[in-house]
A protein has these predicted regions:
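Glycine-biased, small-residue-rich flexible motifs in mid-sequence functional cores and linkers
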Residues: 1-33, 46-53, 57-58, 83-90, ...
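An accessory alpha-helical subdomain
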Residues: 35, 40-42
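N-terminal accessory alpha/beta regions
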Residues: 53, 60-75
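Extended, charge-enriched "interface" segments that sit outside catalytic cores
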Residues: 80
Length: 354
């Protein structure tokens, strides 16, 4: 943990605009990500950054809010709402002090310290804020993600432990969502083997920092826990956050091992894997087929997932998927014409993307 960490002025402004500071009540609701995106783009169009809002310049804020929204589906926030959110400075200070006492830090998308991997993979859908504790270098470390049902079968659990051990032997971080079942099985096995862990949480980041199983790893650089949601958000109030969390898991990893899955939108594992497989340049999604209780894994195979051969090593399985992906890219280039251009990141400016 970086003891000298300090909030940048840009991040202070984004916190004021987008965070609830653990409170449900307030005269003005914090901006949603789509609302923040249109506001940030308008601000950037005037040659300004979020930090410029801290002066509470009503003329500037009025000019920003008077801009036409860049999205036909999202209304530009009103001037009074922006001013009301920005005037919560004392509340922000109290909240940040509390988070810091738990070892929690915050970066915003307007911050140069924001994870490049998250920014590049999700672009305009990257969360405006990330709250984290532990080794921030693991944001860029890649690794293997592990997902699956909360009610995990014995076969799936053993498969996870075996693959985790293979990944740790190769020095690969283990990425998971921290939930009961597949996620915690992967994290616990990684800790037991001395591996590094990245946990993408939906809620209760403060509580997770105090868990005995996490404390040592957070302090010695062996773990990174992060969330795009208020660190004081409790399990009963996170709603669709669990579905959003899937995107962050896939963004942080180089591939994903699906140990067990149902079928359909009611299965978060299924929905996350299907969404990833629809991406034009998705990361490899591997499925474990040795679990009779997992009909979803068989169906994911039909949608482009790859079978994980339990008789082969982690390196061998990943080499096979890399060869297959290379063949697909060659076919795609021959079919569509090759283009080496990188996708444009919205609102890119020095210091970070607002």
């Amino acid at each position: 943990m970086d003891e000298n960490f300090a909030l940048t002025p840009d991040t202070q402004a984004v916190l004021l605009l987008c965070s609830a500071f653990g409170r449900k009540n307030g005269a003005f609701a914090p901006l949603t990500l789509p609302q923040y995106n249109v506001f940030a783009k308008a601000l950037n169009g005037l040659g300004k950054r979020p930090a410029d809002l801290l002066e509470l310049d009503e003329q500037l804020i009025g000019e920003v809010c008077a801009q036409e929204s860049s999205s036909p589906k999202v209304q530009m926030p009103e001037k009074e709402r922006i001013l009301g959110l920005l005037r919560r400075g004392m509340t922000l200070s109290t909240a940040v002090d509390k988070w810091s006492s738990y070892g929690v830090r915050v970066v915003s998308r307007a911050d140069g310290r924001y994870p490049k991997r998250m920014r590049d993979y999700l672009m305009g859908k990257a969360p405006a804020l990330l709250y984290y504790a532990g080794n921030a270098q693991l944001f860029e470390g890649g690794g293997m993600a592990f997902v699956g049902s909360r009610d995990l079968s014995a076969e799936a659990g053993e498969a996870i432990r075996k693959v985790v051990r293979g990944c740790v032997d190769l020095g690969m971080p283990i990425v998971s969502g921290g939930a009961r079942g597949a996620d915690q099985t992967a994290m616990q096995e990684a800790f037991a083997c001395g591996g590094k862990v990245v946990g993408a949480l939906t809620c209760d980041l403060l509580k997770a920092c105090l868990e005995p199983s996490n404390r040592d790893a957070l302090s010695n650089g062996g773990a990174l826990l992060f969330s795009a949601f208020d660190p004081e958000l409790r399990p009963f109030s996170y709603g669709a956050a669990a579905m959003e969390r899937n995107k962050f898991i896939y963004a942080m990893a180089d591939g994903c091992f699906v140990a067990q899955s149902g079928i359909g939108s009611k299965s978060g594992t299924w929905s996350g894997a299907v969404e990833e497989l629809k991406r034009p340049s998705h990361h490899p999604v591997y499925v474990f087929l040795g679990n009779p209780a997992s009909e979803g894994c068989v169906e994911l195979l039909k949608k482009g997932a790859l079978k994980w051969d339990m008789d082969k090593s982690v390196a061998e399985n990943m080499a096979s998927s890399s060869a297959r992906k290379a063949e697909q890219l060659i076919e795609q280039d021959l079919f569509n014409g090759f283009s080496a251009a990188e996708p444009e990141t919205p609102y890119e400016r020095k210091g970070g993307t607002p």
